[in-house]
């Protein structure tokens, strides 16, 4: 019989790290065990939740709170909710944690140099050149979580490996059962005492020069993933001139 415990999995990280891909993968597997699942993707819900809004810090936080409000309603009604959202500011994420309750935070991390390399849209390079203003991680800071339940390094770990971490955390917190996960993964998983491993990142890093250099040379210096998540490039002078969206 399907479990009815609702919960929210909030996937945060810079644009292009793989949050939406991970959310879709998790949702498909939860549906295998008859879970009611909803994905609240900030990009897909643009017209409904933030049409006409700009990219200021307050406006971004308003979007995060709106997604959190909807996620909270669904969670209370026994829905498994997955929210892939850049959500760059820690205070808004923590507010959602408090109000939603049954909540796990997943930090999907990837070095900015890698994001630039694999960005087929060219948005990162445009942001570095000043063509796209208010781009998180380039001209605006991203605040990495200090104690996310799950950290996924998407440049090093596969979707399956990252999903395994999320399923383990859901099991540890009692949001899914070992029987469900045996159907999903084919393995017998055991709950472990939940622990939070702090992510050793600067809590409010500022953009720097590293990614701009990487964009020109195509090479980046080695570093722990997301040590440069927000240490990337100086804000371009053109950035303040427009309010074009860049998610």
Model-assigned labels for residue ranges:
Residues 1-6:
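Phosphate-binding P-loop
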Residues 11:
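Hydrophobic anchor at the beta1->P-loop junction of P-loop NTPases
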Residues 15:
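The conserved Walker
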Residues 18:
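Conserved glycine(s) of the Walker
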Residues 21-72, 76:
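Conserved substrate/cofactor phosphate-moiety recognition/catalytic segment
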Residues 46-55, 59, 71-128, 134:
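ATP-dependent NMP and nucleoside kinases share a basic, alpha-helical "lid"
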Residues 109, 117-165, 172-188:
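Small-molecule kinase domains that catalyze NTP-dependent phosphoryl transfer to phosphate-bearing small molecules
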Residues 179-247:
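Polybasic, lysine-enriched low-complexity intrinsically disordered terminal tails
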């Amino acid at each position: 019989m399907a479990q009815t415990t609702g919960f929210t999995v909030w996937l945060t990280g810079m644009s292009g790290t793989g949050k939406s891909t991970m959310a879709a993968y998790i949702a498909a597997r939860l549906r295998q065990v008859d879970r009611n699942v909803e994905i609240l993707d900030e990009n897909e819900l643009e017209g409904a939740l933030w049409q006409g809004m700009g990219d200021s810090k307050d406006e971004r936080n308003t979007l995060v709170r709106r997604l959190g409000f909807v996620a909270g309603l669904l969670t209370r009604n026994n829905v498994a909710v997955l929210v892939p959202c850049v959500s760059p500011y820690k205070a808004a994420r923590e507010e959602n944690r408090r109000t939603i309750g049954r909540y796990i935070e997943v930090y999907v991390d990837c070095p900015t140099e890698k994001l630039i390399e694999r960005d087929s849209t060219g948005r990162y390079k445009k942001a570095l050149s000043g063509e796209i203003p208010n781009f998180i991680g380039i001209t605006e800071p991203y605040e990495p979580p200090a104690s996310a339940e799950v950290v996924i390094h998407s440049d090093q770990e596969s979707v399956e490996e990252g999903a395994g971490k999320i399923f383990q955390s859901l099991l540890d917190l009692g949001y899914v059962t070992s029987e469900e996960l045996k159907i999903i993964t084919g393995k017998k998983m055991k709950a472990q005492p939940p622990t939070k491993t702090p992510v050793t990142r600067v809590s409010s890093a500022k953009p720097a020069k590293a990614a701009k250099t990487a964009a020109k040379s195509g090479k980046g210096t080695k570093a722990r993933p997301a040590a440069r998540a927000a240490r990337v490039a100086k804000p371009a002078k053109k950035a303040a001139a427009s309010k074009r969206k860049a998610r």
